C-alpha cells in the first residue's frame, strides 16, 4: 500500500491522479486539497475517505466542514493547512498539482519531511529550482516529473548516466494556432485559444500551450530537473503529440518515448516509479498511424518560448518575473480584459523593467512576484 497526498486534487492533474488511484487498490489517498471547490472536495472525500482535506479559502473551508461533519476527515485551511498536508506523517509521496507559486512552500515542506515529490507544479522549479534541487538532494528525496514531456525524458534516461546525455529534445504540439501569423493572432478569442488539438488540460495551461509559454516553462524546468545547460535543450514541434520527448546521447543514438496523449500515464509512472503497472485506455496502433512529423517552432510569432529561454539564461529572479507576468496576463486574457498578443507585451515589459536579484531566497522570490503583479495592475 502506498499513501499519497495531493495538492490540488480538484484540478485537471489532481482529478486524473484520483482516477489512477481509483483503479489501483494499493494506492491510498490520505489527503486532498483545493482552492475553494467545495462541492468537488466533498465528492472526493466521500469516495476516498482521506484523513485530511486542505482548503485555501477559509470561508470555503468552513463550508466544507459543515458538509462533511459526518465523516472522519479533518479540514484545515490557508497556507498552514497546505503545509500540514505536505508534511503529514501518513503520506509517502506528495503530488504537487496545485497551480501557481502558492505550491512552492508546501513542496519545500514535503521535501523537509522526506516525501518524494510527484511534480506537476511548474512554478516550483521555474522560479525556485536553485533552492529545490539542492534541498531534495540534502533530504534524499526524489523529484518525479508528472509533466508528459519531462516524464518522457525521465523514462528515456532511466539507467543512463547524466554524462552520457548530449541533448534533450522537448516536443510541442504547436497548440491550436500553429501556422498562424501575428496578424491572425490579433483576432483570436478565448474560446479559440481553449480548443487544444490533442490534450485535455486546465484553462491556464491551455492558454500557455497556445502562446508557447508552456514549452518555455518546460525548458526552464528541464534545466533543473536534468541538470542540463540550455544550449543542450531543444524544442521540436511534433503536431500529432505521439512522441512526448526524446534524448540524444553522446554517441548519436536517440531514445524517444511514444504514447497516446493521456496524462494518466506520466502520473502513474511517477506514483509507482521505478515500476510500471497496467493502465487501461487507448494504445498506439502503428497500422493506423499514418505519419509522425516534425517542425521548427516559430519563435518570431510565438514569442513566449524565446522570452522564457532568455529569462532562464539571465537566471536569478528573472524567471520569477517571466512566470508572474505570464500568470497575470493569462488571467486578464481569460477575463477578456486584454487580447492574445498582449500576453507577450506584458511579459516583455515586465522583464525589461526588472532589476535582477542574482541569488534570490524564497522571500525575495515571492516579493518579486508581488512587485510584478502590482506593476502590471497599475498599467493594464
What are the language-model segments listed below?
Residues 1-380:
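Catalytic, metal-anchored helix/loop core of enzyme active sites in primary metabolism
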Amino acid at each position: 500500500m502506498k499513501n499519497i497526498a495531493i495538492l490540488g486534487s480538484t484540478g485537471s492533474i489532481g482529478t486524473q491522479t484520483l482516477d489512477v488511484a481509483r483503479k489501483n487498490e494499493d494506492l491510498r489517498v490520505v489527503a486532498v486539497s483545493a482552492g475553494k471547490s467545495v462541492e468537488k472536495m466533498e465528492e472526493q472525500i466521500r469516495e476516498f475517505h482521506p484523513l485530511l482535506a486542505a482548503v485555501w479559502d477559509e470561508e470555503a473551508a468552513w463550508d466544507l466542514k459543515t458538509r462533511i461533519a459526518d465523516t472522519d476527515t479533518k479540514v484545515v485551511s490557508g497556507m498552514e493547512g497546505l503545509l500540514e498536508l505536505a508534511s503529514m506523517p501518513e503520506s509517502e509521496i506528495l503530488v504537487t498539482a496545485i497551480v501557481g507559486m502558492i505550491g512552492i512552500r508546501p513542496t519545500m515542506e514535503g521535501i523537509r519531511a522526506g516525501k518524494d515529490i510527484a511534480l506537476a507544479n511548474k512554478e516550483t522549479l521555474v522560479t525556485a529550482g536553485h533552492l529545490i534541487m539542492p534541498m531534495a538532494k540534502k533530504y534524499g528525496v526524489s523529484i518525479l516529473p508528472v509533466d508528459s514531456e519531462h516524464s518522457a525524458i525521465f523514462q528515456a534516461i532511466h539507467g543512463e548516466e547524466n554524462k552520457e546525455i548530449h541533448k534533450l529534445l522537448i516536443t510541442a504540439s504547436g497548440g491550436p494556432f500553429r501556422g498562424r501569423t501575428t496578424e491572425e493572432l490579433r483576432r483570436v478569442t478565448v474560446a479559440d485559444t481553449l480548443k487544444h488539438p490533442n490534450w485535455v488540460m486546465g484553462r491556464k495551461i491551455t492558454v500557455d500551450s497556445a502562446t508557447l509559454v508552456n514549452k518555455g516553462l518546460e525548458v526552464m524546468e528541464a534545466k533543473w530537473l536534468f541538470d542540463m545547460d540550455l544550449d543542450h535543450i531543444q524544442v521540436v514541434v511534433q503536431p500529432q503529440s505521439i512522441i512526448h520527448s526524446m534524448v540524444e546521447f553522446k554517441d548519436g543514438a536517440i531514445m524517444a518515448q511514444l504514447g497516446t496523449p493521456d496524462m494518466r500515464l506520466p502520473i502513474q509512472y511517477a506514483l509507482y516509479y521505478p515500476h510500471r503497472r497496467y493502465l487501461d485506455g487507448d494504445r498506439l496502433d502503428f497500422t493506423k498511424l499514418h505519419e509522425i512529423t516534425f517542425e521548427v517552432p516559430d519563435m518570431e510569432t510565438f514569442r513566449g518560448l524565446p522570452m522564457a529561454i532568455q529569462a532562464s539564461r539571465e537566471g536569478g529572479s528573472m524567471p520569477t518575473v517571466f512566470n508572474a507576468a505570464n500568470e497575470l496576463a493569462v488571467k486578464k486574457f481569460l477575463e477578456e480584459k486584454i487580447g492574445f498578443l498582449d500576453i507577450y507585451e506584458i511579459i516583455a515589459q515586465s522583464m525589461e523593467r526588472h532589476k535582477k536579484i542574482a541569488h534570490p531566497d524564497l522571500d525575495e522570490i515571492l516579493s518579486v512576484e508581488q512587485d510584478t503583479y502590482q506593476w502590471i495592475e497599475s498599467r493594464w
